[in-house]
Amino acid sequence: MTIRNSWAAIIPALWLSASICVWVGAWPSARAAGDGPRTTHPSVSPAPISANGLAGLVRAYRESPSAARRAAVEGYAAAHPAEAHLAALALGVAAYEQGDWPSAAAWLRKARPKLAPIADYLAYYTAAARLEMADDRTAVLAELAPVRTAIPSSPVSGKAWLVEARARKTAEPAAAVRLLRAHYAELPQPDGDLTLADCYQAANELASAVEFYQRVYDHNLTGEAANRAAAALVTLHDAMGAAFPQPLPEQRLRRADRLLDARRFDQAEEAYRSLEDVEPGLERERAEVRAAAIPLFEDDAAKAGQALRALHPTQPEAEAERLYGLAQCARRLQNDDDMMAAVKTLGQFHAGSVWRLKALVTAANRFLIDNRAEEYVPLYRAAAEEFPTAPDAAVYHWKVSFYEYLHANSDAAALLREQISRYPSHSNSASAVYFLGRLAEAERDFSAARVYYEWLAAARANYYYGMLARACLAREEVKDAKPSQSARQLLASAGLTAPQPPPVEPTAATALRIRRSRLLRSAGLADLADAELRFGARADGQPALLAFELAEEAPAPFQAVRILKTMVPDHLSLAFEEAPRKFWELLFPLPYRGLLEAAASRHRLDPFLVAGLIRQESEFNPAALSPARAYGLTQVLPATGRRFARKEGISRFSSAVLLQPAANLRIGTSIIRSMLDSNNGSVEQTLAAYNAGPNRVAEWMSWANYREPAEFVESIPFSETRDYVQAVLRNADVYRRLYGK
């Protein structure tokens, strides 16, 4: 069963008022004159979309509580008895959020009889309110029974264990500790560790209490949890005296590393320097090296290099890390001799160290940027061969493989086959299969080429190389060739067989999860409804179905895109026919279609290319603002926008103009047209220039005599730009198949 059909199967059981045709029939195309965002289909949720409906009234009350707004919710419930239980649930949750524990418990009791599918929510909030009211421990524990037996598993179960532990802490702290340890994986953090530490302290197991308070302090640099843990540690230190277990050097080092990762450089340096009081050893020397390297993160490589050269670690791994730091400093200072000297020393004395791998890659990347193949190819080869299990070993191997292919060297085919066999699950395997196909075509082995392209067209249909493969399969000599058995065997031996449709028959858990989320949303508790679906996506094994439900409720197209990307990271692996059209429209939205098509037509551009670029730049968020201060749908810098606004006759330009979809589309398409003209009509070069700048593209084009655009794209040294070009072209292809005539 496909996702398209499985979603239809869910509907009758979940939502009797929604007809199946809404889900699986013909969806309306994007608005022909669509100058505004897409709106959610009215049959998606039972909650009235009017601000005067229950969901709207509850939302307003929770956002800004007042007696008048509470009265509005109560009045709605009185006038609509069929929704009174939902209103009671909402009022109970709102009262809990406001700290009105008696009212929360009272409202939740009223809601309980008619909300069995979400009894765990009622149980958790009621128990939590009664705990705050200091009710009898037995009564609090009894309230939690529906959470313990919830099917499917509940997103509030972790918080419920904390409520139970707090209820038990005073009278039976040891039982509270056992409870939390038994369900540790479910506990929300850092509250879980804080509560466990509290219970250990109540049980007079002070050393264990210190361990978990220290864990909270180490993992949380700021916030209430960190402050509570710090205060508790001070109290326990005073109480325990010499028996207080001091944090281990590795714990202190990890906290210092977190401070560095957070770019809190002064605090990080202080934390590293504080390890000078520990016994000589690896952690102490690592702290010295990392403190010395901090100026490197502040763009002062010379100062960092001077500090690192002054150190003389005795521990091999600390010395290896110091040498890597020196290589980094030399690269920043463009001192290739010193960089390679550090790499050479690492090879002589620390051949198996991860710091040598890092130095090899640092140096290789440095030379790759300048197209110095005689330097970077041996470095990548060493990284791939000497560190074959490294997380990015496939990338290092691919750099060598593609170089050999691009320059038509004799071992290119063997390296491409090796890429597939060694790293079949890596994304570069698709690149290798494509270029094996191109090699086969060059040798007029169209039978092998057909096999390679057919695999890409099936397994990578919505990816860049799948798109290219479909074009190759359209050639008569490839299409008519008999498939090569040896090529099939090569792919099969690497595990690259034809993809099987995903198991998407909706489970009972998925169906119930959607029903629960709709009840919560109908009560105006959209945050809980969203959390229910996200939890189910992680726990139930059918993230696509649940992500679709959540994306349908997104208030704007860009939010739906983000939901689906996050919850279904492999969404592009689905075939078009395995999901309803609406799923793809949410993933590849086309709001402002009329404006976009008009702007594209004005500048003689493919509207689907423009749409593909916008999806990659801003996901169709008209208010998008990048860290580089690029604005709007097409992410235009104000200085560039001002220049092209004049060309478009847009007067009184300001940065705010770029947040207007109509103006941004006119300016953005004008920029694209100008860049396309400057690049002799090459879409690939234009996209690379749009992302990385025109000067770089001119340099990259001089690196080789590219036989096809894909070779240029694969040669782009910046991963971000290379991925960007491929993604925009892939997006455009999907838009064309989805919305084209």
Task: Show where each model-derived region lies.
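N-terminal leader/linker segments that initiate helical-solenoid repeat arrays
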Residues: 30-93, 97-99, 121, 228-230, ...
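Short solvent-exposed coil/turn linkers within tandem alpha-helical repeat scaffolds
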Residues: 44, 76-84, 108-120, 147-159, ...
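TPR repeat positional signature
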Residues: 53, 57, 88, 123, ...
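Structural register within alpha-helical repeat arrays
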Residues: 56, 91, 126, 164, ...
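Residue at a conserved register position within TPR or TPR-like alpha-solenoid repeats
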Residues: 60, 95, 130, 168, ...
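Residue-level detector of the short coil/turn that links helix A to helix B
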Residues: 64, 99, 134-135, 171-172, ...
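Single-residue signature of alpha-solenoid repeat helices
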Residues: 69, 104, 140, 176, ...
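Catalytic glycan-binding domains that act on GlcNAc-containing polysaccharides
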Residues: 349, 354, 358-361, 370-375, ...
